[in-house]
Every structure is written in structure tokens, then in C-alpha cells.
């Protein structure tokens, strides 16, 4: 089996675990859909697709929703695209959950989870940052460790 197939199996496994975690531990944060995409190449295209789906497909259907993707060394491009599309400039942290605030009904509350494939996939699952965009457009970041939450 080639390397990309192993990546695929790992990330499908992670996504299933995340769905169960949010379903059991955080019932107020129910994932509606997981969009699995690879962005090793064609990163700009992938993020355009994510933005289109978030704006035209998921909004108004179920809130919150999840869009899941991963990237490697191009985090600067990811930051630029996300800040232009739906968010203020995010923190530098690679593995993040972005919380979208309501803006005149244009976006429902939602989350974009970006997993770093170059970390251990278990570490990516257990330790990630949450980006919180408040109503006053002030940003705060904190780290959520799922090991601590599950105790």
C-alpha cells in the first residue's frame, strides 16, 4: 500500500472519532457534515470549494457544520485564503478550529477544522486550538485538550 492510502485511512479514522466525540461530549456542537479534501496541491482551489460549500450549501441547512481538511507546508497560503474568505486573520497555529460569527445572516455559526497531517494523527486529535470570533470582532485563542475533557 502506498503512503497516500495510509494517510487516507488515518484521516477517515480521525473524522469518525471527532464525530463521536462531539456527539457524546458536546451535544450542543453537532457536526452536520464532514467534507474530506486533500490540499497537498491545488490549495487555492480547495479553499474556494470550501468557501462555496460553506456559503451556498451548508448555511441555513444545519448549524453548526463542519468542514474538515488538512494541509502541509502551505499554512501561509491557508491563512491568507481563510482571512479573505470568511474570517479575520487566524492565529499562526497549524491545527485550528475556526468559529464563524453571524454577520447579518450571511453565515450561520460553524466550524472549520484543519488537521495537520505531519503531526502524529493522535496528537492532532487530542490537542488543537480553537479560534473564537466574538460579536465584538475581538479574537481569542485557547487550547482544548480532549484528554482533559474526557476525564
UniProtKB/Swiss-Prot annotation:
Coiled coil: none annotated. May be involved in cell wall organization and biogenesis. This is Protein ECM12. It is a multi-pass membrane protein. Keywords: Cell wall biogenesis/degradation, Glycoprotein, Membrane, Transmembrane, Transmembrane helix. GO terms for biological process: cell wall organization. Glycans are attached at residues 2, 132, 137. The chain crosses the membrane at residues 17-37, 51-71. The keyword rRNA processing does not apply. It comes from the Eukaryota. Its main location: membrane. GO terms for cellular component: membrane. The keyword Membrane applies. It is found in: Membrane.
Amino acid at each position: 500500500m502506498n503512503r497516500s492510502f495510509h494517510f487516507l485511512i488515518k484521516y477517515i479514522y480521525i473524522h469518525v472519532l471527532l464525530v463521536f466525540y462531539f456527539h457524546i461530549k458536546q451535544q450542543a456542537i453537532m457536526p452536520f457534515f464532514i467534507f474530506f479534501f486533500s490540499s497537498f496541491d491545488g490549495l487555492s482551489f480547495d479553499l474556494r470549494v470550501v468557501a462555496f460549500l460553506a456559503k451556498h450549501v451548508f448555511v441555513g441547512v444545519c448549524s453548526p457544520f463542519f468542514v474538515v481538511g488538512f494541509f502541509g507546508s502551505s499554512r501561509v497560503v491557508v491563512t491568507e485564503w481563510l482571512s479573505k474568505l470568511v474570517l479575520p486573520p487566524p492565529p499562526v497555529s497549524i491545527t485550528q478550529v475556526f468559529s464563524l460569527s453571524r454577520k447579518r445572516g450571511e453565515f450561520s455559526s460553524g466550524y472549520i477544522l484543519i488537521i495537520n497531517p505531519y503531526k502524529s494523527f493522535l496528537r492532532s486529535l487530542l490537542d488543537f486550538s480553537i479560534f473564537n470570533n466574538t460579536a465584538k470582532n475581538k479574537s481569542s485563542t485557547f487550547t482544548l485538550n480532549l484528554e482533559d475533557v474526557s476525564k
